[in-house]
Amino acid sequence: MDHLAITNCQLTESDLTHLSQCLNIRQLKGLDLSGVTMTDFSPKILHILLEQVAATLQELNLEQCRITESQLKSILPVLSCCSQLRTFSLCGNVLSMAIMEKLLRHTTGLINLSDEFYPAPQESYSPHGALHLGRLAQLRDKLIEIMQDLGRPRAIWLSSSPCPCWSNKTFYPEEPFLCHCYMSA
């Protein structure tokens, strides 16, 4: 087994614990947990699961998981050890600009990471939930500045998810925004 998709269903902490103990899990290249609500999970459970797959994982999809910022903070150290990671998506979750900055800093060493899909920062939405494109542009510029400070070229997509359906996802801008910075010698 090199790809595993468990999507849009209810899992318990016990289910994820058992999954992390499977013998073949260390060979996993793709893990898709999109739509699995993680709000009530201990951050340690996901951390342990990612530890098991860190050496081989190439694709990680945590879309629409309701992952909390404390859970995300908990997995950042192990996420930065996923040296083979190429694609990572957190679309459909609510993330602040502060946690997105931490995420960018922790993943900057992942040289294979080429496709990054993140939600528009929660600060780009009005109190009523409407996406404010002007504010999003300002936050995008701030993210570009952060990536330039980190010194590694990368491409990132920001998305809004007006509803849980993948087909209604809109990316801003329609192309990824690129950071063309180079590490100094």
Describe the role of every protein-language-model region.
Residues S83-R86, M97-A185:
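C-terminal capping region of solenoid repeat domains
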Residues C22-Q71:
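Eukaryotic tandem repeat interaction scaffolds
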Residues T17-R26, L46-A55, L76-S83, L103-G109, ...:
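Leucine-rich repeat
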Residues A5-C9, G35-T39, N61-T68, V78, ...:
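Amphipathic alpha-helical protein-protein interaction segments
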Residues L4, L16-H18, I45-H47, Q52, ...:
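Sparse, context-dependent recognition of short Cys/His-centered cofactor- or disulfide-binding micro-motifs
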Residues C9, C22, C65, C81-C82, ...:
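Generic recognition of cysteine residues
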Residues D2-T7, R26-S34, L57-E63, L85-L90, ...:
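Conserved hydrophobic beta-strand positions in leucine-rich repeat
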Residues Q10-T17, T37-K44, R66-K73, V94-I99, ...:
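Short, solvent-exposed loop/turn at the beta-strand->alpha-helix junction
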